[in-house]
Amino acid sequence: MTPIERTKIVLGKFFTIAFAGVTSALVTVLSIALWTAVLSKGEAGEVLVTFMASIDAIDYLLVFFMLIPVVAIFAAVLLTLSIYARSFKEAQGYMTPLVFVTIIPVIFAMLPGVQLKGIWAWVPLTNVALAIKELIKGTMDYVQLFAIFGSTALIAGSFLAFCIYWFKQEKVLFR
């Protein structure tokens, strides 16, 4: 028997974490789509019905696809933190600040007047949140959407590459 390469171990762990995240994203988007369909049948106010009916199925699909590289970013970061941590409790301690680092860029996307222009198009997580907002409003520039998807995927790939590099370091594994 030959030992398994460390890269394969990291990728196996990464895809396990990412699968859970993608499944969660899919359930969330499907739930939103289902409730949109229910509310657009006339159960809500007329303004809400008009708004909900204007969201196409392709928009929901694009929202889901925009979440995939975000899931990959978090899977890589969480895996990196879990490799570094000596125990579950220590890993939880490292992951708590990650929640705040995550929430802040998304909150900026919800502020009035913040649009998917200029610097905001390049701020990770904020750009995805703004793109999702633009998709729902029906005002998304699809060329910009692909640029945001690509830049987010590039960040996710960089984090995964760092995770693989770090997992190969003896000093991290046996500290």
Descriptions of predicted regions:
Residues 1-5:
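Short helix-to-coil transition segments within interhelical loops
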Residues 6-7, 142:
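Alpha-helix N-cap/start motif
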Residues 11-44, 69, 73-74, 78:
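Hydrophobic alpha-helical transmembrane segments that constitute the membrane-spanning cores
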Residues 19, 61-69, 119, 150-154:
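Hydrophobic alpha-helical transmembrane segments of multi-pass membrane proteins
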Residues 33-62, 138-142:
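Membrane-interfacial helix-loop-helix connectors in multipass membrane proteins
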Residues 53, 107-122, 126-154:
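Membrane-interfacial helix-loop-helix junctions in multi-pass membrane proteins
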Residues 57-58, 85-122:
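Transmembrane helix segments
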Residues 80-86, 153-175:
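Junction motif at the cytosolic side of a transmembrane helix
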